[in-house]
UniProtKB/Swiss-Prot annotation:
Pathway: Carbohydrate biosynthesis; gluconeogenesis. Substrate binds at R61, Y195, K201, R322. ATP binds at K201, H220, G236, L237, S238, G239, T240, G241, K242, T243, T244, E285, R322, T447. The gene is pckA. Keywords: ATP-binding, Cytoplasm, Decarboxylase, Gluconeogenesis, Lyase, Manganese, Metal-binding, Nucleotide-binding. This is Phosphoenolpyruvate carboxykinase (ATP). It is an enzyme of class 4 (lyase). It comes from Sinorhizobium fredii (strain NBRC 101917 / NGR234).
Length: 536
């Protein structure tokens, strides 16, 4: 076995059972990994210097193929309603089969860190079959100083072999694709998929399991901080504007996707960004667009034209086109990945029913309710002519990555909000003047104006009304914003149609929250939409 690159000589791949490998390349940097990926035909060089790869059959995550080892340590710690179990015996069989499959291969290893806060950092070794995967994860996680690699010891190891196919009968899984996490041993096995995001989200899942035991809140959110040290957290599901709205030229970006919140403040889990690229434009998102013209950026499933220039409007491979780049490719990104205690929490939703106001102030109890609900709406099946919006509830704004019961995260959040006196807002980036198909998308200028007022504190002194359906406080007037847009009912041509639509959405919230009722106290149950209305 030939071993190349900088590494801890006493901690090679043989220590975790690999044998008879061809070449192992440790901690190669971008130029070397470009050479490898191009030599092996894994990717193409774009006209502007990025590396572009295709993932084949899997162009997104495979949540139904994700498993957690159920053992004595995890048995009563995991939310099994939301996580599929694999037995220790099946996991061990899978591990042995993957090690056997790797014999004769050349592999790539990156020694990286998840978590910018040293006290809560997770040293992570990622072993990949593909060179472009090695560059991807090197971009996404935190890269330790080169001198630290000689003594690096991982607490988590990820083995990603896309050419390995799982056997449902032998491994106790659903199909050939598998993402199996042994949280007790700190080992993740990925096979049968080339989608690189599985590696990133596996680190997130492990941190989401470990950190609550240390009273640290893991969050699927973006974060930024103003010149006065006023940190803001942006929760939101895909497509609600997390990345776009946290990229503010007047504020320092901490990170765009995964963070922890401890008694010291907020810290990024990552050292890079994984941004959606579909319909990316220089005019709308200049900083993110600029990264596509940088050496070192990895593009995933982006279509290239005959000149090897990316066509970001082409979704023929998938709508989920992505770009992965180091955080320092963004001009105003934090160098430390840390920030003081948050002053503001923004919960983003894209309400396609056109019912929610563009902004509302939440009590701590309402914040926990909406955090556990994790609501947004998407337009379902438009290609078949179906234009009815579809409600999506993803608890904690990231259900697929939350191994513990949502109430654990919700209670942590409620305590941190109360302890730090954080102001919470619900921001609707969805539809106004009617539902999807009738109304129009909330103007980004309106959203940015309202966000600016929320972040600088001026919105706190506005006059508020109590929303009749949802019970939260809605500003009546905000400088620079048309008063009418603040009251969604007044933007509809038919007020009674609005009332009926609002009632439908309230009922959806209540039905979804039923599973959490026994896990929260009365004050959170009383924060449910419609409860104030019902009491009157």
């Amino acid at each position: 076995m030939e071993q190349l690159g900088t590494r801890n000589p006493s901690n090679g791949l043989e220590t975790i059972g690999f044998s008879d490998l061809s070449v192992v390349r440790y901690n190669f940097e971008a130029a070397e990994l470009y050479e490898e990926a191009l030599r092996r035909g894994e990717a193409q060089l774009t006209a502007h210097g990025a590396l572009c790869a295709r993932t084949g059959q899997h162009t997104g995550r495979s949540p139904k193929d994700k498993y957690v080892v159920r053992d004595a340590a995890t048995g009563d710690q995991i939310w099994w309603d939301n996580n599929s179990a694999i037995s220790p015996e099946n996991f061990e069989r899978l591990r042995q089969d993957m090690l056997a499959h790797a014999k004769g291969m050349s592999l790539y290893v990156q020694d990286l860190v998840g978590g910018a806060d040293q006290e809560n950092a997770l040293p992570t070794r990622v072993v990949t079959e593909f060179a472009w995967h090695s560059l991807f994860i090197r971009n996404l996680l935190i890269r330790p100083p080169r001198e630290a690699l000689a003594s690096f010891l991982p607490k988590l190891t990820i083995i990603d072999l896309p050419s390995f196919k799982a056997n449902p009968e032998r491994h106790g899984c659903r199909g050939e694709t598998i993402i199996a996490c042994d949280l007790t041993k700190g080992l993740v096995l990925i096979g049968g998929t080339s989608y690189a995001g599985e590696m990133k989200k596996s680190v997130f899942t492990v941190l989401n399991y470990l950190l609550p035991n240390k009273a640290v809140m893991p969050m699927h959110c973006s974060a930024n901080v103003g010149p006065a040290g006023d940190t803001a957290i942006f929760f939101g599901l895909s497509g609600t504007g997390k990345t776009t709205l946290s990229a503010d030229p007047n504020r320092t970006l901490i990170g765009d996707d995964e963070h922890g919140w401890s008694d010291k403040g907020v810290f990024n889990f990552e050292g890079g960004c994984y941004a959606k690229a579909i319909r990316l434009s220089e005019a709308a998102e200049p900083e993110i667009f600029a990264t596509t013209r940088r050496f070192g950026t990895v593009m995933e499933n982006v279509v290239l034209d005959e000149r090897r220039a990316p066509d970001f409007d082409n979704g023929s491979l998938t709508e989920n086109t992505r770009i992965a780049y180091p955080l320092d490719f963004i001009p105003n990104a934090s160098e430390t990945g840390t920030a003081p205690q948050p002053r503001t929490i923004i919960m983003l939703t894209a309400d396609a029913f056109g019912v929610l106001p563009p902004i509302a102030k939440l009590t701590p109890e309402q914040a926990m309710y909406h955090f556990l609900s994790g609501y947004t709406a998407k337009v379902a099946g438009t290609e078949k002519g179906v234009t009815e919006p579809e409600a999506t509830f993803s608890t904690c704004f990231g259900a697929p990555f939350m191994p513990r019961h949502p109430s654990e995260y919700g209670n942590l959040l409620k305590d941190l909000i109360a302890r730090n006196g954080v102001t919470c807002w619900l921001v609707n980036t969805g539809w106004t003047g009617g539902a999807y198909g009738t109304g129009s998308r909330m103007p980004i200028k309106v959203t940015r104006a309202l966000l600016s007022a929320a972040l600088d504190g001026s919105l706190n002194s506005a006059a508020f009304r109590t929303d009749a359906n949802f019970g939260f406080a809605v500003p009546v007037s905000v400088p620079g914003v048309d008063d009418r847009i603040l009251d969604p009912r007044s933007t509809w041509s038919d007020g009674q149609a609005y009332d009926a639509q609002a009632r439908r959405l309230v009922d959806m919230f209540i039905a979804n929250f039923a599973k959490f009722e026994s896990h929260v106290d009365g004050s959170v149950r009383d924060a449910a939409p419609g409860t104030k209305l019902a009491a009157e």
